[in-house]
Regions:
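Helix-coil boundary/capping segments in enzymes
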Residues: 1-215
């Protein structure tokens, strides 16, 4: 789903996120592989690679009427190269449509956006406006600056125009240490900070006037 230009970039350089880890490893090196439960791995593949497996395990097994996809990795969100981030976000949205949403009516997608580039994010949201396959816009709770900062407002304005809520998934690629005391050694230290990162974003959205501007 990537153009040849950005596929070459990905295979040559990989993803360059702001976190201080090397070698293209996932941001949860201390956690379960792919940050997923062991029973989420289908036979012969990785999580989110087998629609039938997911359909049986999560939709049919629990009588789920609607499930919303939150594509996390690799989605390009938070990449240092804004052009690549936008290309990956667009490709991820196209992948959702072809591999999942058009094949399973109970699924809805999240509009993945390159949130550190608000103009590109707004363009991606407007490109998906009116598509009933998408239920929300997806951001992460650890952005480079607090989410209420005016630099992110074009994202929220485009979401309002499209009639889509904005969802924040815990974690992200801000480059800042995950705890007030610095970088942690264990996963339990990281995961306990997810709640506070979300709380901080809500406070920022309120005090910066986002809800007043976009009620």
């Amino acid at each position: 789903f990537l153009s040849a230009r950005w596929w070459e970039h990905l295979t040559t350089w990989g993803m360059r996120q702001r976190h201080g880890y090397t070698g293209g490893q996932p941001p949860f090196p201390k956690a379960q592989p792919m940050a997923s439960r062991r029973d989420a791995w289908p036979p012969g593949g990785t999580p989110c690679s087998d629609l039938d497996f997911m359909r049986f395990q999560l939709l049919d097994n629990y009588g789920t009427d609607v499930g919303i996809l939150n594509p996390l990795q690799p989605s390009g969100q938070g990449d240092r190269n804004n052009g690549f981030s936008a290309a990956m976000a667009h490709a991820t949205n196209e992948w959702q449509l072809e591999a999942w949403l058009r094949k399973e009516p109970r699924l809805r997608g999240s509009v993945v956006v390159p949130y550190e580039d608000s103009a590109a994010s707004a363009a991606e949201i407007r490109a998906r406006a009116g598509d009933p396959n998408f239920a929300q816009v997806l951001m992460m709770s650890r952005t480079a600056e607090p989410a209420g900062n005016p630099r992110y407002w074009p994202i929220y304005e485009a979401a309002v125009e499209a009639g889509l809520p904005v969802a924040f998934h815990a974690f992200g690629y801000s480059g800042w240490a995950m705890t007030n005391g610095g970088w942690p050694s264990f996963y339990i230290e990281e995961v306990s900070e997810h709640a506070t990162s979300c709380q901080n974003q809500v406070i920022s959205l309120v005090v910066e006037g986002v809800f007043e501007r976009l009620p």
